[in-house]
Amino acid sequence: MTIVKFKPQRVDRRNHNTPILFDKEIDEYAQAVLADYKPELLSEPGTINFQHFLESYLGMGLDFQDIYSDDPERPILAMTVFKKGKVRVFDKENERIRRITVPARTVIIDNAVMEPGKESLALFSGMHEGGHITIHWHVYTGETYDGDEYSMDYNEEDALNPIVCCRREHIEIKGNMKKDRTAKEWREHHADYFAAAIIMPIITFKPFVNKILRENGYYKGAITIGRDDDLDILADDIIPDAITETYGVSKRAARIKLRKTGFVLNK
């Protein structure tokens, strides 16, 4: 299957051609990908199957391991192996750390993420990696865009590690706005925003939320937290619960999306 390729209008030449993007551009790209992959998700709210998306649409291999992290407080939830390489995993049977060879085009999800009750974390972790694959393929492989003015010679000495490790703080971003990001932080933001954009596409998300607001008798625009207890419950519990049930995301991800789309404001 041929995927919808991402071609940014601007890149940071000093940082491996990391795309310079507005969130709106990622929303538009995510919608184009969904239109190509599973268009029904643009007309009817539902939960995307991240494993099918990664394997069948993006053509990635998918593996599950006990990923070793050198910092237990910052566990690695998932990683993308753009080029063949070795990664460290924990061998529970022999109680030791070992290095395994992983083929190119592989996404590894930590086994702990796949435990029962963590479906929303697994979904976001998988689609976060999908964001790196679709938006940052050229950044980590050195491949250039076809006919793109941003092409550059690939310098192995200056190349980024083609194995991207995504820790909990990269995937469970709190939604805080930070303008002065490093190139790496921007790439993690791109991947995180893409995950939210393709899991909860604006084209279905806004009508879905508006419907819940109307069903609860609210027609006055954004809800500002802290002014009315009943509205606080609607904004921070009732609507997020409905989003969680429909899209398969965590309640926190639902709350962040409500604020990013202007439905809920903090006082």
Task: Name every feature range the model reports, one short phrase each.
Residues 1-267:
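Active-site hotspot residues in diverse enzymes, especially metal/ion-binding acidic/histidine motifs
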